[in-house]
Regions:
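Short catalytic/metal-binding and nucleic-acid-binding patches
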Residues: 2-171
Length: 171
């Protein structure tokens, strides 16, 4: 999954000599990403990188969450909230909400958007593909000078041009 900062603003830090140096906002994003496992049962945080104006990540959603629950419980009783199945869009929406709230508290800009509305997702189907994407994520700071999300490489920042191989989702 990839999600970008509103207007591609470089909000989370800088890449220096091929290494991502997070600022305070970048650390907030990292903390909020890790905290998702405290709010959603059955998810695992895999590789991720917070870049100056976007984030790449792999999140594993266990589709068996909630399996085996007795969904015919008595009137007024419901399975525990942590047993509920959660889709990627709900998880991304929560992450963006949590991180935006904290960042806006720090910079005293309550209610201002931090993230673009959408995100890019890709379902990983093979171990080979998983390894390739992990390498891409780890090497992203090294490739920053060539990155399509680097504002210096964008011809039409306002047009929201993206690689054709990604799938846009709302969050």
């Amino acid at each position: 999954m990839t999600t970008c900062v509103k207007d591609h603003a470089c909000l989370f830090g800088d890449v220096e000599q091929g290494e991502m140096i997070l600022n305070e906002y970048g650390h907030v994003v990292t903390k909020c990403w890790y905290d998702l496992t405290n709010h959603y049962a059955g998810i695992t945080i895999d590789a991720f990188i917070v870049m100056p104006n976007h984030m790449h990540c792999i999140i594993v959603i266990n589709n068996d969450v909630g399996a085996g629950l007795n969904n015919t419980v008595g009137a007024g009783f419901k399975p525990a909230p942590t047993d509920k199945r959660h889709g990627l869009s709900e998880i991304v929406r929560a992450f963006k909400t949590f991180s935006s709230r904290y960042i806006n508290q720090i910079r005293n800009t309550l209610g201002m958007p931090v993230w673009q509305r959408n995100y890019y997702e890709h379902v990983i189907r093979t171990e080979k593909e998983l390894q390739s994407i992990r390498e891409y994520i780890v090497n992203n700071p090294i490739q920053w000078e060539l990155d399509v999300e680097n504002p210096q490489n964008m011809k039409d920042v306002g047009a929201g041009l993206k690689p054709a191989s990604t799938k846009l989702k709302n969050a």
